[in-house]
Structures are given as C-alpha cells and as structure tokens.
Amino acid sequence: DVDIAWVENTLENMSLEEMIGQLFCPIGYSTDPEYLNMLLHFHIGGLFFRDGVAEEMQSTFTYAQEHTKIPLLIPSNLEAGGDGAATNGTAYGKQMACAAANDPVYAYRLGKIACSEGSALGINWAFAPVVDIDRNYHNPITNVRTYGDDPEKVYAYAREYLRAADECNMAVSIKHFPGDGVDERDQHLLTSVNSLSMEEWDKSYGSIYQRLIDDGAKTVMAGHIAMPAYQEHFNPQLKGKIVPASLSRELLVNLLRDKLGFNGLVITDATPMVGFTAAGKRSETVPMAIENGCDMILFNKDLKEDYQFMLDGYKNGLLSRERLLDANRRILALKASLRLHEKKIKRQLVPGKEALKNLRTTEHIQWAKELADQSVTLVKDIAENLPILSLIHISE
C-alpha cells in the first residue's frame, strides 16, 4: 500500500529531533512569519489557532504548510459551526441546540457547516464532536456543548457529525475521554472524576465510544479526568489515587486500546490545564503522557521547554523508543489517511482564496436560522401564558 509505504519511509528517515517534535501540537498566538518559524523550528506535528479572520487564517496555514518538511495537522474547535475556525464563519448553534431541535439532521448540518468552512481555511482536524453526557447539571464544562443526557441521543447525533466530517475529509476527535459530565468540577482548575461504576460506564459513555470507534472516528481526545472504577480494576495499586486519563495507561491502553479496540491517534486535552499540571512535574508528565498512551501533546506552557522535557525524558528512559515510534507512526498514519502527503506534493494542503466563498453561504445561514427556530424549547408554563394570542393581554 502506497500510504503505508509513505508512513514507514518517512519514519525511517526521521531524526530523533523530528520524532520528538511531531508529538507536539502547540497553539499559535501570532501570525507573524518570524513567530511561525520559531514554532516550525521544533518540527511540530500540528498547529492550532483560535478563530481569526478567515483570510488571515488561510494565509497563515499556507505559510506554515509551505515551510514544514512533514505536512501539519491543523485542528480547530469546530463544535458549533464555522465560527470555530473563523470569526467570519457561520455561527450555527451549540450541540444542545441540535438536540433540542430533536432531529439528527441538525447535527449533520452542524458537521457539514463546521467542517466545510474549516476545510476552506486549510483545517483538517475537528476537535469535535463532544460526546460527553449531561448527567450533572452543575458541571461547568458540558452543559450546552453536549447533545444531552441520553446516551442513545448523544451517539446518534455524534454519528451524524462524523458522517458530515467524513464527507469533508476532516478527521474528528471524540472527546473528552473517558467522559465529562458526572463531576461538577472543572479540569481547568483540577483533575475531575468520572465516578461511574464499570457497568454504568459501559452502558453509557463506553457504548458511545465503542460505536463511534466502530464507525471510524480517527482520533480521541484524552481528558484530564480520572475514572477510579476502571483504573483500580486494571491496577489495584491505584486505589485512592486520582490520575487523569491523559496520564493513565489503564484508561488509554487497557480500556481504550485493548477493550474498545481503538487503533487511531490519541491527543491530550490542553496540557496547561491544572487537571494535567497538578499531576506532577512537567519534566516528568510531558514524556509520561506519551509513554502511557497519548500520541500528541496539545498546547504548551513553553514549547521550547516542553520539547526539551520530552527529549530528556527519552534519553533518561521515561519515554521508550517503542512508544516514540508508535506515536509517530500513528501521527503519520493520520496524515496519510487525510491524503496530506499527496496534497503536499500537489501544493493543495490549503485551498486557494476562492474556497472562502464556502463561508456563510446562503444555505448555511438558512440552516442556522432554521436551527434557531426549531431549538426553542418550552421547559414549563405554569401560568399557561402560551401560546400568546393577540386577543389576550397578560397584564389585564
């Protein structure tokens, strides 16, 4: 197979420094070429930007792809529409709005708008759909970002997003493994906990992940979320310890790889979050995240420092060569599955400016208006004020 040959040939000819660099997907804070060159100097595997003006983002991604040896993964938080990629993209609606409209077609349209508009900029990886479950309404992360509290509905709607993403040749990242929405605390501030039993998890989150993996989801985002039931099941010595999934071999290898059969790429959630940083010294946790089952590190406090931590971790044995090669192979395989190696040769990694006409199309705007209408939900009407009729004056 030509694609496999590209992966293996590329890997065989990579230096240690290049393999270390591929493990990182930093966030960009400037579109200045000098700044971009600094990031690219570390042989990064991916590059993330928050939403910006479409023309500027497209130009930035073009520059980055033209100045890197191995094509970049360009991810974006495409959770609610094209506005996740560009400020002048279509703001479609949150996942909860799709669920409230009560038809999976709205989730398909979300995926179609988000991924087609993202693709127009050169984005090739959606950090979506969110497949968390709103089990606890106090949770500060999930709420309107999810498809609700019914696992079957969450799966059905996430599957439609995945279908649309596939049509746009966009990789998805189902998140946040092993599942947010149980705890009411925020991983930005600490390591939160999914406290479900193994049986409860299997029937809910586990069922969602299993089916989406079987449907072809290419990547999984590991949250800074512990799940004691499964962690202690696979390793009784962890009893009483809170270890985030992003650092847990038990959850990433024993559960995700071995039990659920996932063979794609695993990326951490943002590692400057306290849910990750509180787990130990960064000089240890950065290489340990890869050693314990993640394939890429999302964001950095300092890319140069993290790069050195990873390199030192490899040299002192925290990161094995076997795991380094495996992670790089998965990164390259994802790129090959998206035809990035072929697009680089043809200089087609980022579309031309004419592709920007796909943003805020008449159809996309109409879809957004329809979702806004259909997602309005009556929660309660104790005073029986609805429907509002022109003949009735509430104040009387």
Where is each model-derived feature located?
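Catalytic domains of carbohydrate-active enzymes, especially glycoside hydrolases
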Residues: 38-50, 112-125
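N-terminal hydrophobic targeting/anchoring segments and the immediately downstream early-domain regions
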Residues: 1-93, 381
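Second-shell residues forming the walls of enzyme active-site clefts
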Residues: 57-67, 82-84, 149-323
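Short glycine-enriched loops at secondary-structure junctions
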Residues: 28-32, 74-84, 124-134, 174-180, ...
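Active-site-adjacent structural elements in enzyme catalytic domains
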Residues: 54-73, 102-120, 319, 324, ...
